């Protein structure tokens, strides 16, 4: 959907100067209008997703140049004199001419045929088909002349027809409250342009931008570079944190699996009781101290509680006693007297009479009491000091049991 809007924008002081010139003259006045023409395309997007495109054609009236008399740049039949136009413009360019104006006293707001002819010839002379015609028609309201009325209108030609274009005066109120004013600078004088060019290098660069703006842009570029570097560092740290979190998750998973395996192993161990383990060191010590005593080396008993020599341990455990248990060799006592061997090579057991068997516990009890008295004399003596004392003083039989 496309719309086309055209309007004239004029500042209040330009319109006021036209009125002031007319009121201070004794006759009608005409002249040329200088300004700028600008076309814009505006797109308004609505909720219905339909783009409303508007073409705005704005004509800014910035200055007017009055002629010294009527019919100064055209003759009676409406032909335009190009040289006279250049003389009127003086230092201004023809490209700045956007139209012409005329003030008529006590007339209707209507274009005459002669004005139409002059307008068409002026369009061909200046090669500008967008020229406008500003018509001002003041009149008196009261007979005393105390009150005057001024009507003004701007016309554009479309073929043989002239239509009125709306005029917006900038300083007569906020005509566009929801929009920025897009006003062009007024036509400047020669002295103004000379002063601006003289000091332009202090404020503007070669491309027309302000020096402060360039410095701010440079600072902005530096800040953007620093921000990119900071973002890169943050990204690298985030990736490192993700990697560490993944490693921690793997370690936790491995720990949980290990705990589960230990639970399963403990559950299996509780269901099946552990087998008794053999005391290898004790077995080797007995073999070393009592090499021929198979009864001491057996691990089986009969129903009466007597050891069975057939089940003695005959396995070589591969233990070096001199390295593992050196004290056993240093404190080894004289070998006990061997018992009588029977015909079958085994140890024969001789039955004692009842009297002798009853006296044996008494004799052993007396020996233990004497030994306890000797050992309790001092608590600082070692076993090596006590054993010879008992051996010499009491003449006790030396026991064949190992000393640890």
UniProtKB/Swiss-Prot annotation:
It is found in: Nucleus. Residues 219-268 form a coiled coil. Residues 391-404 have a biased composition (Polar residues). A motif (pSXXF motif) lies at residues 401-404. GO terms for molecular function: microtubule binding; polyubiquitin modification-dependent protein binding. One of its GO terms (biological process) is response to ionizing radiation. Phosphorylation of Ser-401 of the pSXXF motif by ATM or ATR constitutes a specific recognition motif for the BRCT domain of BRCA1. The keyword Coiled coil applies. Its main location: nucleus. The modification Phosphoserine is found at residue 401. Residues 339-404 are annotated as: Disordered. Residues 7-161 form the MPN domain. Signal peptide: none annotated. One of its GO terms (cellular component) is nucleus. Keywords: Chromatin regulator, Coiled coil, DNA damage, DNA repair, Nucleus, Phosphoprotein. Belongs to the FAM175 family. Abraxas subfamily. Involved in DNA damage response and double-strand break (DSB) repair. Component of the BRCA1-A complex, acting as a central scaffold protein that assembles the various components of the complex and mediates the recruitment of brca1. The BRCA1-A complex specifically recognizes 'Lys-63'-linked ubiquitinated histones H2A and H2AX at DNA lesion sites, leading to target the brca1-bard1 heterodimer to sites of DNA damage at DSBs. This complex also possesses deubiquitinase activity that specifically removes 'Lys-63'-linked ubiquitin on histones H2A and H2AX. Component of the BRCA1-A complex. Component of the BRISC complex. Homodimer. Interacts directly (when phosphorylated at Ser-401) with brca1. The phosphorylated homodimer can interact directly with two brca1 chains, giving rise to a heterotetramer. This is BRCA1-A complex subunit Abraxas 1. The lineage of its organism: Eukaryota, Metazoa, Chordata, Craniata, Vertebrata. The gene is abraxas1.
């Amino acid at each position: 959907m496309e719309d086309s809007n055209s309007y004239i924008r004029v500042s209040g002081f330009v319109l006021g100067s036209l009125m002031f010139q007319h009121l201070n003259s004794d006759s009608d006045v005409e002249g040329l209008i200088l300004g700028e023409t600008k076309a814009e395309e505006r797109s308004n997007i609505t909720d219905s997703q339909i783009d409303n495109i508007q073409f705005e054609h704005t004509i800014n009236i910035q200055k007017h140049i009055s002629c010294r008399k009527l019919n100064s740049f055209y003759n009676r039949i409406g032909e335009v004199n190009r040289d006279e136009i250049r003389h009127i413009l003086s230092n201004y360019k023809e490209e700045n001419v956007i139209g012409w104006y005329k003030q008529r006293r006590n007339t209707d707001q209507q274009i005459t045929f002669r004005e139409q002819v002059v307008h068409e010839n002026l369009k061909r002379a200046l090669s500008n088909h967008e020229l406008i015609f500003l018509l001002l028609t003041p009149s008196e309201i009261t007979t005393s002349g105390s009150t005057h009325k001024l009507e003004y209108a701007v016309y554009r030609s479309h073929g043989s027809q002239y239509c009125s274009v709306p005029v917006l005066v900038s300083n007569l109120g906020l005509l566009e409250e929801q929009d920025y004013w897009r006003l062009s600078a007024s036509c400047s004088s020669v002295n103004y342009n000379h002063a601006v060019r003289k000091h332009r290098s202090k404020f503007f660069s070669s491309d027309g931008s302000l020096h402060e703006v360039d410095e701010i842009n440079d600072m902005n570029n530096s800040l953007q570079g620093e921000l990119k570097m900071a973002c890169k560092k943050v990204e690298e740290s985030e990736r490192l944190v993700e990697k560490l979190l993944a490693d921690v998750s793997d370690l936790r998973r491995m720990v949980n699996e290990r705990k589960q395996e230990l639970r399963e192993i403990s559950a299996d161990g509780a269901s099946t009781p552990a087998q008794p383990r053999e005391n290898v060191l004790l077995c080797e010590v007995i073999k070393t101290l009592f090499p021929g005593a198979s009864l001491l080396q057996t691990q089986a008993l009969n129903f009466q509680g007597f050891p069975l020599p057939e089940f003695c341990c005959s396995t070589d455990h591969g233990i070096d006693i001199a390295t593992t248990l050196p004290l056993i060799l240093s404190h080894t006592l004289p070998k006990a007297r061997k018992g009588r061997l029977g015909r079958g090579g085994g140890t024969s057991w001789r039955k004692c009479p009842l009297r002798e068997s009853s006296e044996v516990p008494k004799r052993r009890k007396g020996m233990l009491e004497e030994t306890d008295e000797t050992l309790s004399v001092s608590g600082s003596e070692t076993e090596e000091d006590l054993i010879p004392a008992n051996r010499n003083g009491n003449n006790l039989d030396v026991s064949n049991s190992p000393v640890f």
